[in-house]
Structure formats: structure tokens, C-alpha cells
A protein has these predicted regions:
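N-terminal-proximal low-complexity accessory segments that begin disordered
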Residues: 1-46
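Buried hydrophobic positions in well-ordered alpha/beta secondary-structure cores of metabolic enzymes
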Residues: 23, 181-183, 255, 325
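Internal helix-loop-helix
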Residues: 47-144, 196
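Gly/Pro-rich turn-and-neighbor structural signature
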Residues: 115-182
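A short core secondary-structure module
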Residues: 184, 188-235
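Glycine-rich beta->alpha junctions and the first turn(s) of the following alpha-helix
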Residues: 236-333
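Long, well-ordered mid-to-C-terminal structural blocks that present hydrophobic/aromatic surfaces
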Residues: 296-299, 306-374
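Alpha-helix capping/hinge segments and adjacent helical runs
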Residues: 359-494, 498
Length: 508
């Protein structure tokens, strides 16, 4: 069943999570005004899946069940699936800024791979167990929170060496009917308005850290789960032309001796497969982040065009404005092209699903992570200083100032002052507000820091092939000297014949 956004909001009423926000308990997540922008953003993924014009991108046939499911819950099987997912994420983020639910997709795809790997290595039954869970999630059209990033404590110490073991989620007890987990996940996207959490390890583990290599599904309102969250976006702020409607909450999620039955446990101490799960999720998620931030970039490009027009400028005549816009387009479409390439060159996994190309996915995410601030700078350049100097919206209706402001803050004659002010506040919201800083930081660190992506690129790039390519060119004489003799690759020889020891003077 494909739910609508209204259905999704209503479904949250069936849960009673323990949530704290701004120092108080939240009685009803669905009715909390400070969380409404986050619920609205996730809701976009539901409504768009029900629109006929978006059906190809937003829905897919699940190969293991034959059912039509939301793209955000689908297991990718082909390069086309990867490309459609990338385009779907861009689409929903064009509307919402960050639709958040694509994390569910990324975790499910990583689990599909890791559970099969664990079964093959250890004779476990995780994969069938996961498939049963997957089909249930798809049938109910749920949204899953990815509880992956642990609190970590002293980062110079491994999980098992921490003074406080609860800075990482770990297994404290194994029972005949399940496991008990304890610990803290520090950064959980959309935590209060998820249906369930997928608890996953955030790093590779050693045998000594086996208790921390745990993956399981936990309802958001399970006994022992506490969520301490922040508000989503800028709810209730009149100047927030975008993020008063759409935003994202993040939460610290504490697991205090939470019982998880075995049918919801997908790894329990298999540390090597925990590493597979972590790296697989990272690749899927970085691929999705490319689509998400391209959607955000589309908002900046559109707002930039409107600001230029309302300021009375013509990019065809004002080359510096045109150049700035082209640079913004180049950045957005440049990292998005890496996402397309990662889709086209995706590799089949032994589990039967497909994985985005690791190098292209990481290069694309690294580009957007390191260029998000350039995107904001270019948007500021074409907009001008008005976006941060504009009086608040209350002055738009103040009889003492309204007429004067409308007269002096108008730009082009055929564009009313209120339209110019509206787009200026939109641009401020996206690029020069607290929410703008949030977009910058999640772009930089979301899905892993730039250093993590650099390591993956270095680890997976075919450097040996590139080295051998040049060695073959040298062997073929492509880099021969002027005499036509090629340089030999034989160690210790600088030419084809080798160096000759000169005979002593006066000999012979």
C-alpha cells in the first residue's frame, strides 16, 4: 500500500515515542508544530509516489516479491534502478530541500548485501530474516531512521576500550528469544518522526569489538528508547520562506537495555560483515546524497535567476553575472554527473543487487562536500547584499513603513516590490540563515567526512592499471629518445644496449 503524506502523518499517531524537544516532553509528534517541517519533507516522498507523472521514478517493482513499492524502499537490481533512484532523490529534494527518506533506501540496500554475505560465511539465517522484514516494511510503506553514528566518546580509542561503553551501541545480553542492546546513537536524521530505527555499526570492527557489531530493527517507541531532538527547520518564522514549511530534525537516540527479538536482528557479532555493511551503506548513501544536493542546487539556481531578474540585470549583457551562474551550474551538474556515472558503471553484488560504482560515488560526494560553500558564495554574488539587509516581513504590512519600503526597494519596473522581497528572503533562508549553515554542514559531513571519501577513492581507484598503462607505453617505445631507441624498463639500464664501461686511456 502506497501511503499519502496525510496517511504518513496519521500513521505517526499510532506510535508513542519518548521524545524531548527544547527541554520538554513531546506529547504527539504528529501534532508538534516544531517538527512539522520535517514531517512535511518526508511527506513529499509519499505524495510524489502517488502522482502518475512521477510513477516511473518514485515507484519500482520489488524483485523478491513482485510488488510495486516506493522507490525509497526498493532494492536496486539494475543500473536503471540506480539512475531512477538518483533522479527520484533529486526530484523530491527540489521540492523539500532534503527529503530524508532516501536514507531508508540506502540502509536496506546495504543490509541486503551484508546479510547474504554473513549467511554465506557463517551459515546464519540473516538474509531470509531480513527479506521478511523488508517485505513487511514495503507493504506498510514505512519510513526508517538510520541509527548509525555512535556518540564515539574518545575517538583515539576503539569501541571496546572506551571508559564509558555506552558511547557505542552494543549487545549486553543474548537470550533464547533475542538480544538486549545499550548505548547511544548521536546523529539520527528525522529521529522523532520515523516509524522504526535500523541500528547499524558506524565503523569497521575487530574481533575484540564483536559486541558492537550489531544491526537490528527497533520500533521508534520501543521500551527503553529515548529521543532528544531539535526542531525541524525554522517553524513559525515569517521570514523563513522555505524552511518554515520544509526542514529536518536530528536527534540523539539513547538505547537503555532495549530488547530486540531475533527476527529483527540482522547481525550480532559478525564483525567482518559489519564492516561490509558500513562501507556498502556509505557508497549507497553518498550516491543518494549527490541527487539530494543537486536538488538543493536547483533551488539555488532558480532563486539566483529570480534575484537577477528582480534586480533588473541581464546576464546576456552583464557577463560577470552570467559567469557566476554558469559556475554554479557547473558545480551542480558536475557532481551530479558523477552520480550518473556511478549508476551506469554500477557493479552487481553477489547478493543479486547492484552497487553504485564506488569511485564515482565518492568523487561526486567529495565534490559536493567541498563545493557547497562555493555554491552559497555564487548565490550571494548574484543576489547582492539585500538578502541580509532586508527588514523583517512585519514591516511589509506596517502602515508607517510599508509604502516607503515598497517604493525604494523595488527593482525592475514590471516586478512588484513584494515579489523581489519574497525571493530575497527565500535566498536568505537557503544561503544566509541558520538553516543555510545546516545545509552546508550536512553536505560537508553527511555520509562521512571528506577524509573518509578520499580514503575510499584511494582504496578503490585502479592505480595499478594506470601504472601498468604507462609501463606498456614505455615498453612500446612511445617515449623513445630522438635516436628512435626506446627507454628500457629493465632496472639499472638507461638505454637499450646498457651503459658501457669506458676503457682506460692509452689502452690498445
Amino acid at each position: 500500500m502506497l501511503m499519502s503524506a496525510a496517511d504518513y502523518r496519521e500513521s505517526l499517531r499510532r506510535y508513542r515515542p519518548r521524545v524531548f524537544l527544547d527541554g520538554r516532553a513531546v506529547e504527539s509528534v504528529a501534532d508538534e508544530p516544531l517538527l512539522a517541517p520535517g514531517i512535511n519533507a518526508v511527506g513529499v516522498t509519499y505524495d510524489f509516489a502517488r502522482r502518475p507523472e512521477h510513477a516511473t521514478l518514485m515507484t519500482a517493482r520489488q524483485g523478491t516479491s513482485g510488488k510495486t513499492v516506493n522507490r525509497m524502499l526498493h532494492i536496486d537490481e539494475t543500473s536503471t534502478d540506480l539512475l531512477y533512484k538518483l533522479e527520484a532523490v533529486r526530484l523530491v529534494c527540489q521540492e523539500s530541500g532534503c527529503a530524508q527518506r532516501y536514507l531508508s533506501h540506502d540502509a536496506l540496500n546495504a543490509l541486503f548485501q551484508a546479510t547474504k554475505r554473513a549467511d554465506d560465511a557463517h551459515g546464519t539465517e540473516y538474509h531470509d530474516r531480513f527479506l521478511a522484514y523488508l517485505h513487511d516494511v514495503q507493504d506498510r510503506d514505512l519510513t526508517l531512521g538510520v541509527a548509525m553514528t555512535d556518540a564515539k566518546g574518545d575517538r583515539s580509542q576503539r569501541p571496546g576500550a572506551q571508559a564509558n561503553p555506552d558511547v557505542y551501541v552494543h549487545i549486553t545480553e543474548r537470550r533464547a528469544d533475542g538480544i538486549v542492546i545499550r548505548g547511544t546513537k548521536a546523529i539520527v536524521t528525522g529521529a522523532p518522526y520515523m516509524h522504526e530505527f535500523l541500528v547499524m555499526p558506524c565503523r569497521t570492527m575487530t574481533a575484540e569489538d564483536a559486541a558492537f557489531a550489531v544491526c537490528c530493527a527497533v520500533p521508534v517507541d520501543a521500551e527503553g528508547v529515548t529521543i532528544v531532538t531539535r526542531r525541524a527547520g525554522r517553524p513559525g518564522e515569517a521570514a523563513a520562506k522555505f524552511s518554515a514549511k520544509y526542514g529536518q530534525a536530528t536527534g540523539v537516540v539513547m538505547f537503555d537495555d532495549v530488547f530486540v527479538p531475533w527476527d529483527r536482528v540482522f547481525l550480532a557479532g559478525e564483525h567482518e560483515e559489519g564492516g561490509v555493511l558500513t562501507t556498502s551503506y556509505a557508497t549507497h548513501h553518498r550516491h543518494s546524497c549527490i541527487g539530494a544536493r543537486a536538488g538543493f542546487g536547483d533551488l539555488l539556481i532558480g532563486a539566483g535567476v529570480l534575484m537577477i531578474e528582480s534586480n533588473g540585470l541581464d546576464p546576456d549583457r552583464h557577463g560577470h553575472i552570467r559567469d557566476a551562474m554558469v559556475d554554479l551550474i557547473k558545480i551542480v551538474e558536475g557532481f551530479y554527473a558523477c552520480g550518473v556515472a556511478a549508476s551506469v558503471y554500477g557493479m552487481k553484488d553477489p547478493a543479486g543487487s547492484i552497487m553504485p560504482d564506488t569511485v564515482f560515488a565518492n568523487v561526486g560526494k567529495l565534490l559536493l562536500a567541498t563545493q557547497i560553500y562555493d555554491m552559497h558564495k555564487l548565490a550571494h554574488y548574484v543576489s547582492g547584499g539585500l538578502i541580509v539587509a532586508l527588514p523583517g516581513p512585519d514591516e511589509d504590512h506596517n502602515p508607517m513603513t510599508e509604502a516607503s519600503l515598497a517604493a525604494v526597494l523595488a527593482g525592475r519596473a514590471d516586478i512588484p516590490a513584494d515579489k523581489r522581497l519574497e525571493v530575497a528572503r527565500f535566498m536568505e533562508d537557503l544561503t544566509a540563515s541558520g538553516q543555510a549553515g545546516w545545509y552546508s554542514l550536512i553536505s560537508l559531513h553527511g555520509g562521512g567526512s571528506p577524509e573518509a571519501m578520499k580514503r575510499e577513492i584511494w582504496r578503490n581507484y585502479p592505480l595499478t592499471d594506470r601504472r601498468q598503462l604507462v609501463e606498456r607505453l614505455l615498453d612500446r617505445g612511445v617515449l623513445a629518445d630522438e635516436s628512435g631507441e626506446r627507454v628500457s624498463s629493465q632496472p639499472g639500464r638507461c638505454c637499450v644496449t646498457g651503459c658501457q664501461v669506458p676503457e682506460p686511456a692509452g689502452s690498445a
